[in-house]
């Protein structure tokens, strides 16, 4: 099984368990919080991801963590499953996949907007409203910065890519010039 399918299967399993008790949002908050703790703490991350550390020690650590931060049994059991199957290293990917499932269940499209500089709140609101109008759907916009695009924005959702960046325009011009054999 490829990694993408594996990640999606774990996310779907967790999501389906959350649906049973109608706690999808709560589970997302918990799993995101756990992921942040693991990501932000080098020692915890190395301990849980290390193939050298005994699984029973990892299980005890997860149980202790769950007790200290008071997470649901669903999330605790899910983390234990990841430990037992040596899959803790893909937790961040599973959280992202779960997030996608959560938004899809609410008919909200996740859209990534990349700009060369940090956008002001009014600019973000304007972009969000334009995208929602174009898609005729509610969106969750993830604003990222990539100064290599020079200026403009790049919009990504599903398998779509709309490149309104200066870098993208320059690449198109370069490609067009090459097709007519003009040296660039």
Curated annotation (Swiss-Prot):
It is found in: Cell inner membrane. Disulfide bonds: none annotated. One of its GO terms (cellular component) is proton-transporting ATP synthase complex. Keywords: ATP synthesis, Cell inner membrane, Cell membrane, CF(1), Hydrogen ion transport, Ion transport, Membrane, Transport. GO terms for molecular function: proton-transporting ATP synthase activity, rotational mechanism. InterPro entries: ATP_synth_OSCP/delta_N_sf (IPR026015), ATPase_OSCP/dsu (IPR000711). Pfam families: OSCP. It is a peripheral membrane protein. Belongs to the ATPase delta chain family. F(1)F(0) ATP synthase produces ATP from ADP in the presence of a proton or sodium gradient. F-type ATPases consist of two structural domains, F(1) containing the extramembraneous catalytic core and F(0) containing the membrane proton channel, linked together by a central stalk and a peripheral stalk. During catalysis, ATP synthesis in the catalytic domain of F(1) is coupled via a rotary mechanism of the central stalk subunits to proton translocation. F-type ATPases have 2 components, F(1) - the catalytic core - and F(0) - the membrane proton channel. F(1) has five subunits: alpha(3), beta(3), gamma(1), delta(1), epsilon(1). F(0) has three main subunits: a(1), b(2) and c(10-14). The alpha and beta chains form an alternating ring which encloses part of the gamma chain. F(1) is attached to F(0) by a central stalk formed by the gamma and epsilon chains, while a peripheral stalk is formed by the delta and b chains. This is ATP synthase subunit delta. It comes from Rickettsia rickettsii (strain Sheila Smith).
